[in-house]
């Protein structure tokens, strides 16, 4: 970029936030003074990296909120790699006591075929360790430990997705802490549906899976609140309509769009009850669920963790406050605002929040997250024994309430 191009992007970003950010007081931050300060820093910038990651985004992060970033054209796919990638290794990971531990393997995936199992510790991906990723990554708000831990795990998880056919080398420790290496090739995503959700972004994908557990309890997991997945999710709920209870697994679900989260919540409530309030620049806006036929009437438990963000937090927080669902897992990060995207000069992209989410009982989710009714953490030794402690706790709770 030339100096003039950088200046044009900078001014477009500052002005858009100035005019459209949800809070005209900017949370007490002097946005005018912040702009003046970073304009001075801009004058000393002589390369694009410094412009994007030492001036422009740090300026945005002064607001201390999620759902805000400015990205050059070549990085727009990085908004949420798990959402936009076509290929996958079929592995999910979390930071457990400072180790990057495999928490889930998709049957039939490259990771499954290579013998990787839940509980194995990943030391590096293509030579990059957790420490490397932590050093490279830009700290992003909200600045709480849950979000920072989740972001680090999420950055490592993003490396488990890529272009079909590309290879990746994973160094790991097995169940006996013996080192191993697996050379894996990204394969088409299992159980994923893909489609366009925003003209400014590439096609998005979400995995949808459901089954009946041994006790007849329904289990539904979907990896995003995305339009391409909505029909599959609603059909899964219909398939499980006679299950006495249903576990909806939103662990690791980074979010999606309002119509999708509202449609799924409506399928579980069926009455025009309050859903989410939005504090907008123009005032408070109330939203309501739709009265729909064929509502699922059984008990609902929702699984969440530090990577359940945005739409996952709205959906969960709303159903919790309405008394429709019991929440199990670990506290969500509080990365929960509604965002718009705006194209910038040179095909860059600005993401910014235009509304603050509140549950029907008035809880602000941004920065606070959803606190589970039953708090349970994953444990490596249990994973090695084939036990998902959070899922087990949900099943035990439902079996107890059925008595």
Please describe what each predicted stretch is.
Residues 2-26:
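Mature N-terminal segment immediately following signal peptide/propeptide cleavage
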Residues 13, 104, 216-224, 353:
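Active-site-proximal beta-strand elements of phosphoester/diester hydrolases
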Residues 25-98, 163-169, 173-207, 395, ...:
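Extended, small/polar residue-biased N-terminal targeting/export presequences
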Residues 44, 118-169, 260, 335-336, ...:
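PDZ domains, with a preference for the canonical peptide-binding region formed by the helix
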Residues 82-132, 226-227, 355-356:
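PDZ/PDZ-like domain segments forming the peptide/carboxylate-binding groove
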Residues 111-147, 220, 247-249, 319-322, ...:
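Conserved PDZ fold ligand-binding element
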Residues 162-345, 383, 397-399:
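Cleft-lining beta-strand/loop regions that shape enzyme active-site pockets
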Residues 374-403:
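Low-complexity, Gly/Ser/Thr/Pro-rich intrinsically disordered linker/tail segments
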